[in-house]
């Protein structure tokens, strides 16, 4: 987004891969502030990407994978959804490499879970709070690679990576 202030973030995974992001606080201030605060509080450290769908998105930020108990929920407070169908002008398109907040059917239910698009997903535009994008092509390649991993089911969850994709940390670079 040209001429827009950015905040850089760096997701480091336990396997050594990295996704570099640029966040847009002027376009989605509540969402960026929430994400940055959770990162600074180390909320995401040790959480996994629990839902990956090839040619769609990879989603994480809400669960720890426990070998004995499976997916263990980690809760954070909900925030206002910053997207058009919720009365907020958010011009960020859900293109390959864009990061956006996951939510339930309730428009103001986003909290900590986010997803990174691994393909253009225009049907999400105006319905989910996009708030940044991958800063470089290598970061997009990492996201796409994770989107292609083998997945399975656990209880009522589907599209769970068979080999956990674990966030080591997310650093904010201001």
PLM regions: where:
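Cyclophilin-like peptidyl-prolyl cis-trans isomerases
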Residues: 1-174
């Amino acid at each position: 987004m040209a001429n827009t202030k950015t905040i850089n973030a760096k997701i480091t995974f336990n396997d050594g891969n990295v996704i570099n992001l640029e966040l847009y606080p002027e376009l989605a201030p509540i969402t960026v502030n929430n994400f940055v605060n959770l990162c600074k509080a180390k909320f995401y450290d040790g959480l996994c990407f629990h839902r990956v769908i090839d040619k769609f998105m990879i989603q994480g930020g809400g669960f720890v994978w426990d070998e004995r108990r499976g997916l263990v929920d980690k809760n954070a407070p909900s925030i206002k959804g910053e997207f058009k169908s919720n009365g907020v002008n958010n011009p960020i398109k859900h293109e390959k490499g864009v990061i956006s907040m996951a939510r339930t059917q309730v428009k103001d239910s986003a909290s900590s879970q986010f997803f990174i698009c691994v393909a253009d997903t225009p049907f999400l535009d105006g319905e989910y709070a996009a708030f940044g994008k991958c800063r470089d092509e290598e970061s997009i390649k990492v996201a796409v690679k994770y989107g292609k991993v083998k997945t399975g089911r656990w209880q009522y969850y589907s599209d769970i990576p068979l080999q956990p994709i674990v966030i080591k940390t997310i650093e904010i670079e201001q």
